[in-house]
């Protein structure tokens, strides 16, 4: 059975990810107390289910301490993958304010004595970060601070389409003006390259459009940058694989995350597709009008 565990910070998009998995045919359970996970997996396997997705939050903090060992045990019999969703505190506060939902640890005394009384939203968020921090190392971390809900759904779809084993390598384009992604393992700054933004015909386009591709592809300095990044990754990917790393996020940043970083992320992904399970995400590139720009808890 393939088991996908969705955890992380409340408000970072766990419900969006779980809904995407349900649409993909997974048996989904939200807010399952972690101690019941092995029994649920066994029951569903006996019942013929082959795909399970479970969202876990910090309300059962005592059980969270048991999760690392539980994940290792489950991995012996099942294909277990962990998605750890994160976001900046500022983004989370804004989302809870917009949706008028209460944080699970905010405003009341938890049944867990370790949590106690948390009166402010910011305090609850920081406490939750402490409670779930130990799970981050088991899965792929994704920063949803500037991520639209439709983009997260598409990313989850690509994630579950990856092969059962091997290193998952994600290339993430972004704009420095909106901050560096929290989930990045490596960050490459390509702002020194010529910027298509200053060509008025190219300005409204992205690095996925042929005119921008042709513009950047004609510049030797762009190919030098791509070659150097590729050479670095080709050298070090085997070491990460030998270290049992399952996920590696390579962030490519330009000023706005629209032209140069998008083109280079796509090019690197194509070149390294045979070396790892590759996923591409464009955090800040414009999307079609009308798509949702909000995530829910």
Swiss-Prot record:
Gene Ontology molecular functions: ATP binding; GTP binding
Q: Where does GTP bind?
A: 57-60
One Pfam family it belongs to: PapZ_C
The role this protein plays is: Displays ATPase and GTPase activities.
Q: Which family does it belong to?
A: Belongs to the RapZ-like family.
State what protein this is by name. Nucleotide-binding protein Bphyt_0592
Coiled-coil region(s):
none
Q: Which UniProt keywords apply?
A: ATP-binding, GTP-binding, Nucleotide-binding
Give the range the annotation lists for the signal sequence: none
Enumerate the NCBIfam families for this protein.
PRK05416.1
Give me the residues that bind ATP, please.
Answer: 8-15
């Amino acid at each position: 059975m393939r088991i996908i565990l969705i955890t992380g910070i409340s408000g970072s998009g766990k419900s969006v990810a779980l809904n995407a998995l349900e649409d993909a045919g997974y048996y989904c359970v939200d807010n399952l107390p972690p101690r019941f996970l092995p029994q649920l997996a066994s029951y569903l396997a006996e019942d013929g289910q082959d795909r399970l997705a479970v969202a876990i939050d910090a309300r059962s903090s005592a059980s969270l301490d048991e999760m690392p060992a539980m994940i290792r045990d489950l991995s012996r019999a099942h294909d277990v993958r962990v998605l750890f969703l994160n976001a900046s505190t500022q983004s989370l506060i804004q989302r809870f304010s917009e949706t008028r939902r209460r944080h699970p640890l905010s405003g009341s005394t938890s049944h867990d004595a370790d949590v106690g009384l948390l009166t402010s939203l910011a305090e609850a968020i920081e406490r939750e970060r402490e409670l779930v921090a130990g799970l981050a190392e088991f899965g792929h971390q994704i920063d949803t601070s500037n991520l639209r809900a439709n983009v997260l759904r598409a990313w989850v779809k690509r994630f579950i389409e990856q092969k059962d084993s091997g290193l998952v390598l994600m290339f993430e384009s972004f704009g420095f003006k909106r901050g560096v992604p929290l989930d990045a393992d490596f960050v490459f700054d390509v702002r020194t390259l010529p910027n298509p933004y200053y060509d008025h015909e190219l300005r409204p386009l992205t690095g996925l459009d042929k005119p921008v591709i042709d513009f950047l592809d004609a510049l030797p300095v762009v190919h030098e940058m791509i070659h150097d990044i590729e050479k670095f990754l080709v050298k070090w990917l085997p070491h990460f694989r030998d270290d049992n790393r399952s996920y590696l996020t390579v962030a490519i940043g330009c000023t706005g995350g629209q032209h140069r970083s998008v083109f280079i992320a796509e090019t690197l992904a194509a070149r390294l597709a045979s070396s790892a399970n590759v996923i591409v995400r464009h955090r800040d590139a414009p999307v079609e009008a009308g798509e949702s720009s909000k995530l829910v808890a």
